[in-house]
From Swiss-Prot:
Transmembrane segments: none annotated. Belongs to the FGAMS family. This is Phosphoribosylformylglycinamidine synthase subunit PurL. The gene is purL. One of its GO terms (cellular component) is cytoplasm. It comes from Listeria monocytogenes serotype 4b (strain CLIP80459). It is an enzyme of class 6 (ligase). HAMAP family: PurL_2.
Length: 739
């Protein structure tokens, strides 16, 4: 092999390690761990394993704040995905993962491989993926490039999900200028597992073979993890080699073969892990480190699809659709025969050792030999300086924004045409959300619901985060994101169980950004404790900045809940004329961070809406009880656009109307006060519902009507709007903007 790689001396003197992502002090630490200077391959291994993307070195102190335990938790953070118990020996595995940087550079493949990666995380646990969700952020749809990004990201998600046959059942999309050059693509996968089948990513048992399964290794995605741990610049467009290419048909075979091994050969399978960020080095070193073992890998045996690949390239490649298995010795042929049935190659590339070293051999030579824990566990942890940004105090002291409401119906129409509020049908119609035929509530309601075959249960799932509130106040905004996710689950008839969090932030080297991360984590933790929804998995994506401009703090909350009986499934749309409409919760003049403020001022500022977690929990529990007792015909949480938008959305599906008198002034129609629900009840259930809610701030507003007119009164004031007209604006906005 021609030795083109820099020598240890050149690496040190020319500071080549800096280009690979290590700081001076980190390089010194590596030298002291090894007792010598690392060679080129070893320097590469440390640079990628100690990147933020793999080691969480900047975010670990913050992640430790999260509550991660609960009686419902079968598997908490630290494995491919978290798992919660839903009874009857079944569990639900789920996780959210970001693919932000790749999706800006190469939006179709960036989004597609994000979907592929999160699916592998879930089936590596032994769970069958049953649903996908996503949470997307883009800039305003006013440039050809913004429209191109949206179209390609959506096509990438659809292309992969539809081909592999997993329904994409829900998600959320927000448009704000801060995402123009930093789009966010967070994908969530939910899987079903028998509790007895739960797998671990571990390699133990001295002499046990380590097997490589799936696609061959190429040069795609080398340093993808490091690429995700730096700020962007316009030149970043050049980094296309760091974006991988996905093959959903290969992944489908891999999924079925791996689940086959887990189901029928659990006695000989020791551990299984997906090759994700940082590829082979990450999966193999983590599996050995978790088991307190060492590993010896022979790079000559790694299946390669390109010529003359170096050990460095093979270890760091992020080629897709690859898994690593550790099996009991003497059973290699059985495993190979099983994978062959699926047309897949399973190759032994190494074995477990007892010396806790990570040894790489190529052409008979040892090309890397480092302590396995040094790679997987011993990355330095940084307690970054944190500083409250000047804007926070300014927002706290600012005069509250008062909207201009001369023409209430005109404002209503404008709000429904905003892309963050408008119907996302144009987008989700590209996803096959009915494949597998278990989807009980399709996209477009508060939460998606998927039936659990062979039972009367269903799983409710949602993704939520209003990053504008976090920009105003990350602690309150973080709590609101969790509360809103739980509201969506409850409105659908589910009991919230746990969350996965996709923490998307700017550059943590900036003290103001690190402050946002800390405060958001405090808010999320407080809400998770109050609502009993521990954090069981997640992902951190930092450095979402381009040319010094960062995103709003965007911790995406993915939540799963249990619908105990299919009869409890509830949707947001009004069902019958004559049904009685109630509002749960208090409406105040809260417009800061609202869709209305953005529309009228072109910016957001002021104090975030208030959230009282005790009240939130009480209302959620009461509403869920009412739903489980069969008293509720429809329920909808009040979110962006407040009461006006929620009321309009409730009328759209059946083309009904509403005649209501509200307990607040009409200029508060679009206030975004928290902890509110719009509920409709059959007349014969009205008394029982009112009795259940009697001590709370629950208001009887009026009735659902047959005609397609919404009438809203407060004392002497009244506004009237046509459902059909509002609906055509709401449905037409995004197709029109994407033209």
């Amino acid at each position: 092999m021609p030795n083109m790689e820099p020598t240890t001396k050149e690496i040190k003197e020319q500071k080549i390690y800096q280009e690979m992502g290590l700081t001076d002090s980190e390089y010194e630490l590596v030298c002291s761990i090894l007792g010598r200077e690392p060679n080129y391959t070893e320097t590469g291994l440390f640079s990628v394993m100690w990147s933020e993307h793999c080691s969480y070195k900047n975010s670990k102190p913050v992640l430790r704040k999260f509550p991660t335990e609960g009686k419902q938790v079968l598997q908490g953070p630290g494995e491919g995905a978290g798992i919660v118990d839903i009874g009857d020996g079944l569990g639900v595995a789920f996780k959210v993962e970001s693919h932000n940087h790749p999706s800006y550079v190469e939006p179709y493949q960036g989004a597609a491989t994000g979907v592929g990666g999160i699916i592998r995380d879930v089936f590596s646990m032994g769970a069958r993926p049953i649903a996908m969700l996503n949470s997307l952020r883009f800039g305003e749809l006013d440039t050809p490039h913004a429209k191109y990004l949206v179209s390609e990201v959506v096509a990438g998600i659809a292309g992969y999900g539809n081909s592999i046959g997993i329904p994409t059942v829900g998600g959320e999309i927000q448009f704000d200028p801060c995402y123009t050059k930093n789009p966010l693509v967070n994908a969530m996968c939910v899987g079903l597992i028998e509790a007895k089948d739960i797998q671990k990513g571990q390699a133990k048992g001295i002499g046990n073979p380590v097997m490589y399964v799936g696609a061959k290794t190429g040069r795609d995605g080398i340093h993808g993890a490091t690429f995700a741990s730096v700020e962007f610049s316009e030149e970043g467009e050049q980094q296309r080699s760091a974006v991988q290419v996905g093959d959903p048909f290969m992944e489908k075979l891999l999924l079925e073969a791996c689940l086959d091994v887990i189901r029928d050969h659990s006695d000989i399978l020791v551990g299984i892990q997906d090759m994700g960020a940082a590829g082979l080095v990450s999966s193999s070193s983590e599996m050995a480190s978790k088991a307190g073992a060492g590993l010896e890998l022979i790079m000559d045996d790694v299946p390669q699809r390109e010529l003359n690949m170096t050990p460095y390239e093979m270890l760091l490649s992020e080629s897709q659709e690859r898994m690593l298995l550790c099996v009991k010795k003497g059973h290699v042929e059985e495993i190979q025969a099983l994978f062959e049935r699926y047309g897949l190659e399973a190759v032994v590339i190494g074995q477990v050792t007892d010396d806790k070293m990570y040894k790489i051999i190529h052409h008979g030579e040892v090309v890397a030999n480092v302590p396995v824990d040094a790679l997987a566990e011993d990355a330095p942890v940084y307690h970054k300086p944190s500083k409250e940004p000047a804007r926070y105090q300014a927002f706290q002291e600012e005069e509250s924004f008062v909207p201009v409401m001369e023409d209430v119906v005109g404002v209503w129409k404008e709000l429904l045409a905003q892309p963050t509020i408008a119907s996302k049908r144009h987008i989700y119609e590209q996803y096959d959300y009915q494949v597998r035929t278990d989807t009980a509530v399709v996209p477009g309601s508060d939460a998606a619901i998927v039936r659990v075959r062979g039972t009367e249960k269903a799983i409710a799932m949602t993704t939520d985060c209003n990053s504008r509130y976090l920009y105003l106040d990350p602690e309150v905004g973080g709590a609101i994101a969790v509360a809103e996710a739980a509201r969506n689950i409850v409105c659908s008839g589910g009991k919230p169980l746990a969350i996965t969090d996709g923490l998307n932030f700017g550059n943590p080297e900036k003290p103001e950004i690190f402050w946002e991360i800390e405060k958001a984590a405090d808010g999320i933790s407080a809400a998770c404790l109050e609502l009993d929804t521990p954090v069981i998995s997640g992902n951190v994506s930092l450095y979402n900045e381009t040319d010094g401009t960062g995103i709003y703090p965007t911790p995406v909350i993915g939540m799963v809940g249990l619908v105990e009986d299919l009869a409890h499934i509830t949707t947001q749309d009004f069902k019958n004329s004559g049904d009685v409409i109630f509002l749960i919760g208090e409406t105040k003049a809260e417009y800061s961070g609202s869709e209305l403020q953005k529309l009228q001022q072109g910016k957001i500022s002021g104090r975030a809406p208030e959230l009282d977690l005790t009240t939130e929990k009480k209302y959620q529990q009461l509403l869920l009880t009412a739903i489980q007792e069969g008293l509720v015909a429809s329920s909808h949480d009040l979110a962006e656009g407040g009461f006006g938008v929620a009321l309009a959305e409730a009328t759209f599906k059946a083309g009904l109307g509403a005649d209501v008198e509200v307990p607040f002034e009409l200029n508060q129609l679009f206030s975004e006060s928290q902890s509110r629900f719009l509920v409709s009840v059959k007349p014969e259930n009205e008394a029982a519902f009112a009795q259940l809610m009697e001590l709370e701030k629950v208001y009887r507003l009026g009735v659902v009507t047959e005609d397609d007119t919404i009438r809203v009164k407060h004392k002497e004031d009244q506004v009237t709007a046509k459902t059909t007209e509002l609906r055509s604006i709401w449905e037409g906005a995004i197709p029109c903007l994407l033209k």
